[in-house]
Amino acid sequence: MPFAQIVIGPPGSGKSTYCNGCSQFFNAIGRHSQVVNMDPANDALPYPCAVDIRDFITLEEIMQEQQLGPNGGLMYAVESLDNSIDLFILQIKSLVEEEKAYLVFDCPGQVELFTHHSSLFNIFKKMEKELDIRFCVVNLIDCFYMTSPSQYISILLLALRSMLMMDLPHINVFSKIDMLKSYGELPFRLDYYTEVQDLDYLEPYIEKEGSSVLGKKYSKLTETIKELVSDFNLVSFEVLSVDDKESMINLQGVIDKANGYIFGASEVGGDTVWAEASREGALIANYDIQDRWIDNKEKYDKEEEEKRTALLKEQELQNKAVDVNEEDEWENALKEWEEKQGMDFVR
């Protein structure tokens, strides 16, 4: 049974960086994975790509041939793939049936593709039907949107709409969480925003933003959106810093539960011990995100830097290369995680 992540999110939310981090992380735990680029405009991929939509269609060609702008060209490209999907699915089939690969789909950043337009949804539904892939949507959103109450409310609406549109297991993630403290102090604790607690507490802050005549009209709209999100009560968030190994480990544990990977890992192979630990709940960190990313961020960052320095020294003592690559760092982070959980992964 094949499994996959569909990585979506607004432009600049760190989707390609996350996919690259996933590739390194899965290599470290022994999970055979492949990344699929679904963005016809992305010609500078930071990761090795197994299947690239640009081999079928590119944004530059569409814009030139159809006289379309970037957004229109992207919509046209995805529609074209939707209408002639057979060869693309054949390549995906080879990855999941012959290579037994866990897939990560790196999607375009235009939000209308996963909130209002049906082509991207149709593509994944066809793959789900023909290949029986168990998907989980990972919706990355820059944590900067937490700094403004009205922007936070708008992001909640975007996340809700994406969940309803894609109709798949869905994990919303505030990315670049290591940058949040530099944006200024938040009026509430971090878990207020990740758990989407009582939104009525935001009302006085929304009123402050809407002091002008036009702002007051937007305040009424924001209030209506707030009520809608509260009525559905579906949205919540995880947090992620790709450079922080523990937050990445924690997120992958959550995703593996969402798409059912922990119950079918033996059919994929390569990381059954990780899957067993996930089933037992050992990989889900029970740490205070307010403490880690706001109150004592500098302390935790210093500890991480000390660990990295110690690893470099260890490599030097073993007469290995001084430059520790990402997979070495993942191996080290996983060993530390195992020690905390009192287990020993066999890789």
From Swiss-Prot:
Residues annotated as transmembrane: none
Cellular compartments annotated: Cytoplasm
InterPro entries from the UniProt entry: Gpn, Gpn2, P-loop_NTPase
EC number: 3.6.5.-
Superkingdom of source: Eukaryota
Similarity comment: Belongs to the GPN-loop GTPase family.
Name this polypeptide is given: GPN-loop GTPase 2
Gene: GPN2
